[in-house]
Amino acid sequence: VLSPEDKNHVRSTWDKIGGHGAEYGAEALERMFTSFPTTKTYFPHFDVSHGSAQVKAHGKKVADALANAAGHLDDLPGALSALSDLHAHKLRVDPVNFKLLSHCLLVTLANHHPAEFTPGVHASLDKFLASVSTVLTSKYR
């Protein structure tokens, strides 16, 4: 459960990301594909090379979904219901991949915002991304 302080950290971070969401989302995906090559199996139709238009487009989708979630912290299941259905029933993404992408996103954010990425912010963002992952995998059961 996200505390009021966690929610403030999440909202503040997403405000600071501003127009860089798509860029950071794509960078996190590239980082995931490089660090965890088996994740590429879910994107057989993608050019997963650095700077790929497909990775950039999917990075924007990831960033937009997380921005939506950050705007609905009190109703993550409602905000992410359609994405949960998509990932569970159509795409059938292994739930461990959400943890891998979350880790890569945290590294990306820390790299771009080192001064703001305090231990407290890191912990709050980790809890937020874990909550998002839990919601996205909730319909697997």
Curated annotation (Swiss-Prot):
Tissues showing expression: Red blood cells.
PTM-bearing positions, type Phosphoserine: S3, S35, S49, S102, S124, S131, S138
GO-annotated biological processes: hydrogen peroxide catabolic process
Binding site for heme b: H87
UniProt keyword list: Acetylation, Heme, Iron, Metal-binding, Oxygen transport, Phosphoprotein, Transport
Top-level taxon of origin: Eukaryota
Residues annotated as binding O2: H58
Residue(s) carrying N6-succinyllysine: K7, K16, K40
A single cellular component GO annotation: hemoglobin complex
Cross-referenced Pfam families: Globin
Flavoprotein in keyword set: no
One Gene Ontology MF term: haptoglobin binding
In-chain residues carrying the UniProt-annotated modification Phosphotyrosine: Y24
Residue numbers bearing the Phosphothreonine modification: T108, T134, T137
Positions carrying N6-acetyllysine: K16
Residues annotated as domain Globin: 1-141
Subunit organization: Heterotetramer of two alpha chains and two beta chains.
Similarity comment: Belongs to the globin family.
Functional summary from the UniProt entry: Involved in oxygen transport from the lung to the various peripheral tissues.
UniProt protein name: Hemoglobin subunit alpha
Organism: Spalax ehrenbergi
Gene: HBA
